[in-house]
Amino acid sequence: MRFKKCLTALIVLSSVFMTFADEEERVLRLKIGDKNLKDKTMEVSADTIYSAEKGQPIPFADMIQEMAASRFIYVGETHNSFPMHQIQAKIISALYEQDRNLSVGLEMYPVTCQEILNRWSLGILPECEFIRTGHWYVNWNYNFGYYQKIFQFAKEKSLPMYGLNAPRDLISQIRMKGWEALSGEEKEMVPQPDLSHQEHRSLIRTIFESTHLPPQMKGRGLEMAFEGLYRAQSAWDETMAFYALKALEKEDGKMVVLAGSGHLLYNLGLNRRAFEKSRLPFKTVVCVAIPKDKQTIEVSRSLADYVWGIPEEEKPVFPSVGLSFKKINGLENLVVDKKPVDGVAKDGNFEKGDVVLSVDGKAFNDINELRIYLAHFNWEDEAKFLVLRDAEEIQVALKFVAEKNEKEKP
């Protein structure tokens, strides 16, 4: 994890990539959460599911059976971990066989995009049109290929899918100025987040402090950054809990909620908030990646109801570009929003304010369209940008080369 700006850290926190640098490993062994389990630990190995209650391995079928009485099943993810999304798809499929009255809640989409999700579940849209009209690459920063199996299953079985998130600009306002700064209409969309839960605050602070911070963030600036981050993280959790409950009012069965693990750890995030409001039973599954040089890692038994160990990947299946773009009034071309600090673009010659004239000879004036184009590149490919910088046209090569032991890069 790393911290460049509060919003960047917020994106990182929403997924919490479960690999085990020393400064991050302690996140998994905190004595918080379930009072009966928080002082106990268990050793987790790859390709094995563990029951926190029992402190030992559990067969997949038994785990699914134990979920029968739950109304919410929360399955955490690292957004660019293909194995974790395969696990999500497997759980959804098994729960569907158990009870076909099933729906899926998504961190990936804001509630304002519900109509496009309805059309997808009804089988009206082909995939390419869904990605385009649903603005997948504007709402979400990750390759649709990670989620393809999940979405295709939902479409085939006509499973209702619900966007649970708030529009990003509202979360940014809360981060900078607090919930009170929202308009009356905006407050109706984003419920006021409870900031008083000390164990949740301790969890987010531990994740925050495990991030490599630049020197200028030390001292008073560090505390201000954390408070803004915590407001935003809490608002995200509160909003997703609110809309998950609202969606389930329309459904008689259970809902599988797919969200970054940072929203679910120790059952203190959106899962806790939804339970406190409804008392509806739930289960949480969190995956942890086991490094190649370790047989097991030690985690707190209060981390989640089920902990699923998976082998650490050498690199993500799909390259992360790391470029953000914006539109400027009066200019048709897209503009590089900030100098890239991660993804394959980090090592390219891109600068904030570069005007994108073309990519591989093609002009783009829509952010989603450019991201759709870039999403088709594989490792070792190369895209050629022509940008305008200081009134000079410059060729910039975007090389899709993985770093050694590349971790998640939002």
Which sequence ranges carry the predicted segments?
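N- or domain-start disorder-to-order transition segments that initiate the globular core
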Residues: 20-70
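A substrate-binding/cap region within the structured catalytic cores of diverse enzymes
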Residues: 98, 102-103, 115-245, 249
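PDZ/PDZ-like peptide-tail recognition elements
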Residues: 297-341, 376, 395-410
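Hydrophobic h-region of N-terminal signal peptides that target proteins for export
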Residues: 12-19
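Conserved PDZ fold ligand-binding element
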Residues: 345-367
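PDZ-domain C-terminal substructure recognizer with occasional recognition of PDZ-binding tails
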Residues: 351, 357, 372-410
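Membrane-embedded segments
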Residues: 79-105, 111-122
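Zymogen propeptides
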Residues: 55-96
